[in-house]
Structure formats: C-alpha cells, structure tokens
Amino acid sequence: MKKLVFDYEMKLSFSAPVTDHRFQLRCIPATGPRQQVIDVEVKIQPETELETTIDSFGSVVMTGFIPEPHDIFSYSVTGIAFVDNAHIHKEAYKPLYRFNSALTIPGPNVEAMIDVCRERLAALPSDAIPVQQAAEVMDEVYKAFVYTPGSTTIRTTAEQALAQRKGVCQDYAHVMLSVCRHVGLTARYIAGLLGGEGATHAWVEVYQDGRWVGLDPTHNRLVDDSYITIAHGRDYRDCMLDIGIFSGYNVQQTQWVNASVHEQVA
C-alpha cells in the first residue's frame, strides 16, 4: 500500500468574456476497490454552487452554472489516496465492457493487430489467466506506437491512431481495449493520475475472477500502487474530466493543466 498526495489543476482562459457557462467535472478520485481517498478539497473560480452525483459507471460528477461574465475558469482538486493493488475488492461483472464503443471500433489496422495477438495468445499455456493474455496484447500495442504529444485529439479513434502509429496514453488505451474485447477479454478505460506525468493518465483494466486488474500500455507494465483512479468507462468519452458549454462571440480558449502525485512516507 502507498499513501499518495495528489494535486490536479486546470485553468481555461477565454479570449473574451463568456456567460451562461454550464460545466460538468469528473475530477475527483473516489474511494473504490483499490483505493481509499480522504481529505479531498475542491476549489473553483469563479466561485459557484456545485451539485455532486455519481454517474452510471460509479464516477463522481460535479455540475455547476456560472451566469456572470468571466474570462477565466479554473478548478483544483487536492487530497490523499491510499492505494493497495494487493487487496483489490471484488466488483459485479458488467457485460457492456465486453463490447466496443465509438472510439474503439476496429478498422484494417486494428484488425491486423487482433490477428497478431490471437497468434500470441494461442502460444500461451491453456490455463493462462486473463491478465496474462492482456499482457500479451499490451506488449503488442506498446511496440506499435511512438508516444507523440499533439499527434491526436480527443476525437481520434483507435483505428486512426494505430494507422499513424503515434499517439498519447488515451490512444494506447483505446487500441488495447479494442483488441482485448475482440479476443474475448472484458476490459474498461481508466482515467487517473500517475506521478511524473504532469497531467492525467489513461490505462486499461481487465476483469479477472471478480476483480479489475490494471495494465498500462503506454509504459508496458502492470498498474501498481503509484496509480490513482479518477474515472472509468467504455472509452475516453465516458471519463472526460471537464465538459462545458457557454455563450460568447468568436471566443478562443486555451487550457493549462498540471497534475502532481507524490508518495508520503510515514
């Protein structure tokens, strides 16, 4: 088990004042099967009332409305997470994670990787467990990509990312999800925090014996106690940390993000 202190900040600057700003945030790590979260503090500017709910995937969602003109919107989340991957609690099985979503539908490039991964899985012992199988897929995804910030967008599909052989963590995760689901593994997308990334991170969890076990295709390794979960879903769209709409004329926006995670040793 690790005691991790986390701090996540996001600042959105507008080129002109905006009004009637409605937003939805999924930025709070919550206590779950592999982590206990305490001392969470959320700050939002401009200040406004927040409504907190839990979405259908179990992620914490905050919604708010800022009617007054403003040219900056920012929030920060701080807290402490006790993460223990050695004692992950069981969760109910959800069949929807067996099927691909809009961002993970395969095309020719992903289908070719599926064929390669099927050959790798066939070479495993007959009693290979899901995590062992997923590790083979993860390795194939890792080798296929060059990590290239700015090469994709939030709308890039698994097929599009793999076609250009470059992307970021969400692209690695989307391709791995697509392949896993086609070879019979139940898998879901995770958005969270990892020390040293400077921003949010994405990885994959595979369902095994009633528990979700994490694998990080960007780094080609199993998820350990250094990872903090924020949200999970079928793909990135279910885990977007911030979504909003506002009124304004010809407004441009610039986003700044910073995330830090460090272990606190007693």
Please provide the spans of the model-predicted regions.
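Secondary-structure boundary elements
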Residues: 85, 95-167, 175, 236, ...
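Short acidic (Asp/Glu) patches
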Residues: 55-64, 91, 95-101
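Intrinsically disordered, low-complexity N-terminal segments that are enriched in acidic
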Residues: 1-84
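Short, charged/polar, Gly/Pro-enriched secondary-structure boundary elements
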Residues: 84-85, 213
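Glycine-rich, small/acidic residue-mixed loop/short-helix segments
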Residues: 25-42, 220-239, 243, 247-250, ...
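Short, surface-exposed linear segments at secondary-structure transitions and domain or protein termini
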Residues: 46-52, 97-103, 222-229
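Hydrophobic/aromatic-rich core segments of domains that either
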Residues: 171-246
